[in-house]
């Protein structure tokens, strides 16, 4: 059975994640508030950002930058 949540990104009920897609408290927040559809939209945006800004995910500062973008994209900087 699919888990239905109220997605804060889409502002409607939608199918939730199967598991937290990110570690820690932020991952739990995403699991509880962000739908599969919204997460897929973020993954597309993330790929664009990594390519356009030439971010290196082995670099800690670049990972922090992409996390900041993720929070802004998904939660509109709550």
From Swiss-Prot:
One Gene Ontology biological process: cellular response to oxidative stress
GO molecular function: iron ion binding
Keywords (A to Z) from UniProt: Iron
Keyword field contains ATP-binding: no
Domain of life: Bacteria
GO CC term (a single one): cytosol
Role, per record: Could be a mediator in iron transactions between iron acquisition and iron-requiring processes, such as synthesis and/or repair of Fe-S clusters in biosynthetic enzymes.
Quaternary assembly: Monomer.
HAMAP family membership: Fe_traffic_YggX
NCBIfam families: PRK05408.1 (NF003817)
Family: Belongs to the Fe(2+)-trafficking protein family.
Annotated protein name in UniProt: Probable Fe(2+)-trafficking protein
Lineage per the UniProt record: Bacteria, Pseudomonadati, Pseudomonadota, Gammaproteobacteria, Enterobacterales
């Amino acid at each position: 059975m699919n888990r239905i949540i109220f997605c804060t990104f889409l502002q409607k009920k939608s199918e939730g994640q199967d598991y937290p897609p990110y570690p820690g408290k932020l991952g739990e927040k995403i699991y509880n508030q962000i739908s599969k559809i919204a997460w897929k939209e973020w993954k597309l945006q993330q790929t664009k950002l990594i390519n356009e800004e030439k971010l290196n995910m082995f670099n800690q500062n670049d990972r922090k930058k992409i996390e900041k973008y993720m929070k802004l994209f998904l939660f509109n900087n709550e």
